[in-house]
Amino acid sequence: YTTLFRSSYLDLKQLVTADMPHPTVISEKKFGASWFMPAGDSYIANMYADAGADYVFKELPGAGSTPLAFETVLDRAIHADMWLIKYNQSEDMTYGDLRAEYAPYENFDAFKNRRIYSCNTGLVPYYEEFPLHPDYLLKDLIWVFHPELLPGYSPRYYRKMQD
């Protein structure tokens, strides 16, 4: 199976070329006083690159996540093109829910331009499938960043956040 998944992953990765636009992206949201941003060598930072995105915090050292102050994230990522969030709730989060959770989120361009994509891990099997099928996640990320490469694709995990 591993060879099959690796082959699928590499086939998907080849859809993305260096000369196409690479939208800037940020990840997750603050938890308590900190925003735990994936580090530059984390699986998700690498997958963003493989999917053709420019991860704003790719220089963060390490492979885990780094706690950052909200102001630090806002300063560096206010103009990020896109924002991807994972959460676990009984219903999908909306822009209104995100604003109610923390009003300063609305300062980000990705919020203003309605370019937030969310993965509700309470409703989709992200954590159950991803370890065995990284190709599924990569396909979703390519769809988010470059939908023209996957016409007619119906994403498994990520959805465009609704108002």
Feature-to-residue mapping (PLM):
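Append "and occasionally in soluble cytosolic enzymes with long acidic Gly/Pro-rich linkers
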Residues: 6-25
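Loop/turn elements at helix/coil->beta-strand transitions in domains of secreted/extracellular proteins
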Residues: 19-25, 51-54, 78-82, 112-115
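Short helices/loops that flank or line small-molecule/ion binding pockets
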Residues: 68-79
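Active-site rim elements
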Residues: 33-35, 56-61, 124-131
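Structured C-terminal subdomain patch of bacterial secreted/periplasmic proteins
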Residues: 85-163
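His/Asp/Glu-enriched short active-site or ligand-binding loop at hydrolase and phosphoryl-transfer sites
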Residues: 44-65, 84-87, 118
